[in-house]
């Protein structure tokens, strides 16, 4: 059984905070991809609305995700989400469909 954790996170930047949020998210990619247990952590921008960013994430297990959520840069983005985003961060967990 695959114990990997798949996540999708959506951030909608306040227009006046877009560049600040984008810079913070890019920094998170650089730091997170070095974490033990991070399988992938990809940042995308919506092709129709450049204020919307998405993370596609995969974690080796719950322990790796728990560690990630306690890092200073994740705690900082969670603390600042109401200032930087419209509607906060939308996070979905997914199960991979094997074909």
Q: Whereabouts are the PLM-identified features?
A:
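Active-site-flanking beta-strand signature of metal-NTP-handling nucleotidyl enzymes
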Residues: 5-11
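Short, surface-exposed ligand-recognition loops at beta-strand->loop->(often short) alpha-helix junctions
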Residues: 12-18
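An amphipathic, aromatic/His-enriched active-site/gating alpha helix that lines ligand/cofactor pockets
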Residues: 33-39, 58-92
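Glycine-rich beta-strand-turn "strand-cap" elements at beta-sheet edges
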Residues: 1-5, 43-49, 77-99
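Short, glycine- and small/hydrophobic-rich beta-strand elements in well-ordered beta-sheets
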Residues: 29-52
